[in-house]
């Protein structure tokens, strides 16, 4: 009621202003409008004060007015404007300018401006007297059209709500205007009636029967005569509108139409026969006045979208246009003498009857190709069929499929292609495609061949030219009981359209599903279904076949929403091409199947097959009851005999792996298997090792495999379809040597003896290599800094305002002794950075290992990052989730080439301490497809509102759960979506998107267009973007707010097992973050999960205890479902998982901009969910009186802030160089290996390590050890002695 109260208030204010004087002549002139009687007269003020007016064109036209006289206190103001003298003034209420006195502001939305000149004046009132400004004219830039880009044909007027004839509008019409300097033949065009929500593929096509010629600069009217009224003539039309239009000259009639909707948004389009929109006229529901018309003007922006300049202001005037509707000059058409060039791309190789033929052509012309037609026939004695073809939006070619039912029983197909540009026409020569029909056999025959290999249940069939009951059949001399059958396959064919992807629509017979058709089909497509021979029985009065509308669960499901589609031309097609129909149904009658009001959930067809068609005898033969090997089959009809020998093979191939069950293997290992089949050949083979697929032979080693048991599984399938699976369990020992034990590092002044004891778990001899190393701690060559950053990790290498550790702090972290340094922050993410200065001799291939020891709080994840100089980013190298507050270690190794520059290496260890403030908000958008297609201003309104309310609502994040656009092949829609979502980019508001089914190729699932506009490169520089999967097919965002840490995990349309594995991997890496999962499809309109939703729930939601919420769209509804999950197996629920569906695209204007707000209330551990439309400024799409809290409710969620810290106990950096000092070979297990390191500097610290390897690829690296050489003792040289002080003996 709030909306209508506001409207009524404005209207009454408007009427009070208009209630006196000459102003009625300027006011909104509506023909036949009822006059309002107002009790109060507000006179015009004598000697009125001056009104100052200022106009400015921004995103909208802004007009501000102020009364100069301080004594006149206006409380209301209205702007009156017009854009053409042929149309009256329109009124816009003016709002008081905030913070100003006697100032008012009006906005005219840019979309309502269609002329370069605008005339306006302003009326103000204080309730007793009113003042009026002078009339002004305003020149507007950018509203002049380029004549060369104006469409050649315009829709200038629609009359969609006229006097009824019976129950239908009797005199609806479409007025067309020719803008060119030549007469246009309408044969290359047609009219399309469009449902904006469903797109062009669902258009109704209207083509007048008679030829239409539209002279230059003149109009032509098309009358949509209602169905069931053949008595109406053009005289009735002229009488109703008081016109003198002549049928065939400037009036055409389209009979038997359902007309145009009066109360729903629709579009009328003039299109070429190739599908190119020339003019598009939209009208919306509630915008029409009965018995009035809608007027349009040529577009100014070079598109086909006509400008709506008048709704309900004028009475219909078929055949007459206003000057404002059409350009001042005629568009000149250049002389064109070139014919289109046709390249026939049809594959003309012979086809089998069960196959279809696709006719394909590439057609080019300097002018617009307006008509393309395929002509074909399968009988040379009949005329060619003409099929108009539209350009395919995926490959820009022209296609038409001749489906198999038209080819069965035919020998060849003749065809040619014709194309025209409105002036010139080209055509190809007639070409032929052979159809390989099975040659008709004669005499007694069977459906198997001599020496065939058979298995399982076989249908043996014998046929003769005579009576079928004369046929007898024997197997191994034993007579068999048979039944009559048809020799060749029978096909059930039907045409269907408007089916939707993944709905399990089906053809069934006697309760058996013969075919599921679950593809998206907007245009009629023919399906052909072979019928099981066991279901077609002689003597049955009728063969009954059912087409069922399915849900996404099953063709027989009764609980969920069913698909709605149309079917026509259902028939049986016999092998000779004979067509048998259900006599109750006309072939061209469209049958509605589904669960809407005018549909049947299923339709059963009945066909009569004459007994004369059953010319065979059939045996259902179970070969598994016989021995394997050769068997003799005989058939006789009393005149002829047929004798065959077949092989029965019901056992699988023989497989012999080279692995012995239970044996232990060492060293290199080649896995392979011998395979053969006694009765036929091996058709398919595959193998796996420990569940992972491998290709035999497979090379591995005991050092590559974990110690313990392993499984080799080999599967082979033979020609008869028999399968054998063999599994061998084998073992490998612990192959790698034990960690070596340092014995001594006896250091002298210039040398040191290095001694280690080595052991191997299987007593193998080992080679021991001695290598140089380096080690750095807080005591030497390591500087440590502390700080807190806005993100985790920091975006820059060295953030500003870092603080170095004091000497006292450095001493505390120089040993792993429990003495720590802790850094905390109330707002940002604290970290410690370690800058290590390494020895200049370190090579780029050397390995640098960082070891950090410290502690955190239970449940917290602490991450170590190393700075990658090549990619200029902090790269995560190790992490740990603390189970308690006890110390733990982070350790990681990196290659010096990417992580050391100018002898410097940098590592940080980071955790977070977020703030605890007020409530924060996440916004959730979904299924914006119709905004991108038809209502981009609504899309803009959504994101602009999010930007404008970011601070007020404390908006931290925005979800989009897919169907960003309606047609992934339409670049215009992607550009609209890109522009709208860029508002969030420019405002710095974190958001994530995924691809819905409309964002990918409907048939091939291609993500190309999605990746171009919303791929990973759009997001990878944003602080919240955690990681991408297949160019943003999936991704995750990391968001923290008010002490709550989230991971937002997305996966787009067409989820596979590989996708699920990736999602589980990501969730396991972030167990300390609450996970909100986003998919396009998950919940159904019933509140249950869809099949893919159930799979996600079982394989992702349940195993990951941090998942708390799942969001989805796709289905036109709003639902929620909460599950209690027991994570620790004690029988008590440990968490709630809230699953929600929100998709409003089924509403007016594609959903009218409704979006979800999730407000997180930490004080009460609740998430308050509400629904709001910035476009209509209204809460709750679903009325609360009818639907209750469907759109507004609260969910329970633990939102207590979790305190975190980074606390360091010890840090060291170990560098393992490739500098080999020496080597000892074939050292026995348990023995000591020694090496003397010479040429050392005195009183110096040296680091070293060893690598131990055995001959079976076992390899172990030691820790880094150190020693210090002795101080050199000074001894004078002989020539330095003073012999004068040496006494003789």
From Swiss-Prot:
<dbReference type="GO" id="GO:0016787">
    <property type="term" value="F:hydrolase activity"/>
</dbReference>
<protein>
    <recommendedName>
        <fullName>Uncharacterized protein YvnB</fullName>
    </recommendedName>
</protein>
<dbReference type="InterPro" id="IPR036415">
    <property type="entry name" value="Lamin_tail_dom_sf"/>
</dbReference>
<dbReference type="Pfam" id="PF00149">
    <property type="entry name" value="Metallophos"/>
</dbReference>
<keyword id="KW-0732">Signal</keyword>
<dbReference type="InterPro" id="IPR004843">
    <property type="entry name" value="Calcineurin-like_PHP_ApaH"/>
</dbReference>
<feature type="domain" description="LTD">
    <location>
        <begin position="141"/>
        <end position="277"/>
    </location>
</feature>
<dbReference type="InterPro" id="IPR001322">
    <property type="entry name" value="Lamin_tail_dom"/>
</dbReference>
<dbReference type="InterPro" id="IPR051918">
    <property type="entry name" value="STPP_CPPED1"/>
</dbReference>
<dbReference type="InterPro" id="IPR029052">
    <property type="entry name" value="Metallo-depent_PP-like"/>
</dbReference>
<dbReference type="InterPro" id="IPR011401">
    <property type="entry name" value="Pesterase_YvnB"/>
</dbReference>
<feature type="signal peptide">
    <location>
        <begin position="1"/>
        <end position="23"/>
    </location>
</feature>
